[in-house]
Regions:
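Positively charged n-region of N-terminal signal peptides that target proteins for export
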Residues: 1-4
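Sec/Tat signal peptide C-region and signal peptidase I cleavage site
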Residues: 15-19
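General helical structural elements
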Residues: 6-7, 30
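Non-catalytic cap/lid and distal C-terminal segments of serine-dependent acyl enzymes
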Residues: 20-293
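Bacterial N-terminal signal peptides
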Residues: 7-13
Length: 293
């Protein structure tokens, strides 16, 4: 019963704090309780998330795929980089939204992933990749309405992601089809999903990122039952959370566990950052530069 009461509380609360203006405070749930040593914060340059004139730009394409686990046609947005060339291979970043979002949250609600990626490409700071922004709510009614059913559907999304979406992407676009060329990251609820799925399926994803990860994040001992396996198979475990965000503890407990067990793990404390796209844009900007290299 407690699990379902928590699910209801989280669903209502997080749905309320999402779907608002992109830069206002969201998700304030109390102070962090775990003491950790944060990694160095390096500020993004001014204008990293602003359109620039005179550079090549990518495109965002809405795709539809048949979901075997959900039993319906589902949608995702795909960012194709400037001068996408079907004759060459690309890596793939799966970028997840929060509990109040959908496949459009990153694109329309303030994340500007296409602009961030275009600028990184122009500066030669990222490896060749496409970015897939799915709907992480694995149920037939996958609208932003939320509710307890949606909370459960977020937990089931790995079946749809791994069983249907990834095969569709690898059949439709010119991408590599191995774990070393797949990364997963997300914001808030999507950050929790990314940590759960990325560490739970290390045969599928080599790079894992969590931006202000929500309370759906499993406890560290559940995420990492085999320390040696993570050390061997994971290439990057990277997190960021705002210093003024009460959800910091979700990331801090994982960072503390990793430090205690000698697992490479990064946790950035974004100065005075809150639960919004100011932090999440920084997360994408930073994480994208570290993967597939």
């Amino acid at each position: 019963m407690k699990k379902y009461l928590f699910a209801a509380w989280l669903s209502v609360t997080m749905t309320t704090v999402h779907a608002q203006e992109p830069n206002i405070p969201r998700g304030m749930f109390g102070a962090p309780q775990v003491d950790v040593k944060f990694d160095e914060y390096k500020a993004a340059p001014q204008g990293f998330d602003q359109e620039r004139e005179g550079i090549a730009t990518g495109t965002v394409k809405l795709i539809e795929y048949q979901s075997e686990s959900v039993g319906t046609i589902r949608k995702a947005n795909v960012y194709l980089p400037p001068k996408y060339d079907a004759s060459k291979k690309y890596s793939v970043l799966y970028l997840l939204h929060g509990i109040g979002g959908d496949e459009w949250e990153w694109v329309r609600d303030g994340g500007v992933p296409n602009i961030i990626m275009d600028n990184l490409y122009a500066d030669g700071k990222v490896a060749d990749m496409i970015v897939v922004m799915p709907n992480g709510r694995a149920q037939k009614d996958d609208s932003r309405a939320g509710g307890m059913g949606s909370f459960r559907a977020f937990g089931d999304f790995d079946k749809d992601l791994i069983g249907s979406l990834i095969p569709y992407i690898e059949k439709t676009f010119s991408v590599y089809a191995d774990k070393d060329h797949r990364a997963i990251a997300g914001l808030s609820m999507g950050g929790g999903q990314s940590l759960n799925f990325g560490l739970g399926h290390m045969d599928v994803f080599a790079y894992v990122g969590g931006f202000s990860s929500a309370p759906n994040t499993q406890r560290a001992a559940q995420l990492i039952p085999d320390v040696d396996k993570v050390k061997k198979e994971n290439k990057l475990l990277w997190m960021v959370c705002g210093g003024a965000d009460g959800l910091m503890n979700n990331s801090a407990q994982l960072k503390a566990f990793c430090d205690e067990n000698g697992i490479p793990c990064t946790l950035i404390n974004y100065p005075e950052g809150q639960h919004n796209f100011v932090v999440w844009k920084y997360g994408l900007y930073s994480f994208a530069q570290l993967i597939f290299k």
